[in-house]
Amino acid sequence: MFLPGFRSDMNGIKATALAGHCRTRNHPFLRFDYFGHGASSGDFRAGTIGRWLDDALAVIDRLTEGPLLLVGSSMGGWIALLAALARPGRVKALIGIAPAPDFTEDLIWGRLDAAQRSELLERGELAAPSAYEADFIPITLGLVEEGRRHLLLRGPIRLSCPVRLLHGMEDPDVPYQTSLRLMERLTGTEAVVELIEDGDHRLSRPQDLTRLFAAVDAMAARFRS
């Protein structure tokens, strides 16, 4: 099951490539769009980490059965971790692609200057530039404040499933140190971080996809055997 990133959708390069790969391996595969993303309805401004987590859990509960391998990209890595904690009996393995746990606090709020924080607190919304979209992205106070209910990197993360993290060392959006911090917080599980020296945030190049496919096949083989 593939979980996209913030402002991404189920028709991105990684999602569609992974769908094709899983077909060739006869792996069941599911991808979806969060509320306010892609083909799903809703105002993006009303979205929060909790709401998007609820979307993921609804998909797990209503549309899947048996053991699950979650593959989360960027914010999807955060959602995947939260889903694994909420459904430990279902999630048997997890792969994070440039995972971004706590990004609303560390990479949004933590990077705002005093004037920007004041504007967000007063207006409830801030327009942020994006390297991937022509228009500015609306960042809401609700996104930041609700995100604080789901922070993971402030304490131990007790997962029972194996975790594999892939992160580019040239990632300009989510520093690769985030995956190293995540590794330190994971307890009770086997976790591996693979750093890609020249990798960016998206990790959508052919060589990146090959690395992802290998990780998926290895994880799937473990809990299918």
Give the ranges of each region predicted by the language model.
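The alpha/beta-hydrolase serine catalytic core
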Residues: 69, 90-196, 200-225
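Active-site loop->helix "elbow" adjoining a glycine-rich segment at hydrolase catalytic centers
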Residues: 74-77, 99
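Short beta-strand element of the alpha/beta-hydrolase
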Residues: 1-5
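Alpha/beta-hydrolase active-site loop
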Residues: 46-63
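Alpha/beta-hydrolase fold nucleophile elbow
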Residues: 63-74
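Conserved alpha/beta-hydrolase
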Residues: 19-41
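The serine-hydrolase catalytic nucleophile loop
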Residues: 7-19, 177
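Short glycine-enriched nucleophile-adjacent loop
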Residues: 77-88, 94
